Amino acid sequence: MKPALCVAVVSMLFGVQLAHAACPSDAVFLILGDQIRGYSLRANGATEPCQVLQGPLTTLMTAGATVIDKKDAFHVAQFLTSSTVDIFPRKAEGNEAPSRSFMLTITNDLLSIAVDSHLNDFVLTVRPSEAGVLIAPANSSGPITNAIHITDPNIVQYVSIAIDSDDNLLIAGYDIRGAAIIDTFGTSRNMTSPPLLRSLTGSKTGLLPGAGLFARNNMTIAVDPRTDELFVYNQTADVTQIQVSVFAAKANGDMPPVRTISGPATGITGSGLPGNKIAISSDGRLLDAEPNLRILAFAPGARGNVAPSQIIEDSTPGPVTLGGIAVRSRGGRQHDGNDDDQ
């Protein structure tokens, strides 16, 4: 019997989960509470995952927001699991323990995460008593009791964070009136007390109001790793309006988007669980996480009521809900050196 056939028979008879090879350099990952599932960025239609990370050793229980750093490691923020952030190497597979973990002991409710070029972790907590961004130094491990704490006086409800190519921190949320606002702080200049560099808000932005719902990712921000354009997934609290607005790099004030993706043809639906809803590949594709293990990909420059250029669907039926999405692709500022040196 041929080896591949033998393995397939053993799997069928004894219920053994087959191991996958690590995903290729260009891949997109869904984060689903207790697991991470990866797919080639070239995939279209029903697709078997090229990488699955799941099992008790992973410690994943409430995984949602996730980011991939310049060394291709996964940084996974667990929403309710003892304020834990787990870091996994690029080729982590199956029931594999994280290479390291740290715990932000003063809080929980971790809704968003970003990593700068120095591998410092920026973690957004929405727990009311500690709401804001906590910074864990590069290579942190174990309990962290003295993390730098950044708050934004303009925001009363925090929702999402990102890091731009200058290593500055973007914070998205809602002000006291429920209006959407995205502030940029100069963390590249000063970590402990960063200056406010830009504030994107106002009627011309077209950003939808949506305050009043605790720990829902009704707004997710992501920065194009090549152009620094700002993508904003945005929905109203009642989910009657959904859009992705794209702003020019370093957009400031009451500035309109350069384009907006919205309408029934897009297939983009609302979201309610913690985790980042969108991610941007190095070639400018918008990747949108949808329920039932689906990913919608939109071509660079897509605008209006446009259908996705790719729909990646897991070949295994999945949960209705979703948690987060992360992308790894060559050519962007987040990746340097040899992608295989992991």
For the regions a language model picked out, list residue spans one by one.
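Bacterial N-terminal signal peptides
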Residues: 6-15
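Flexible "stalk/tail and boundary" regions
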Residues: 21-342
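Positively charged n-region of N-terminal signal peptides that target proteins for export
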Residues: 1-4
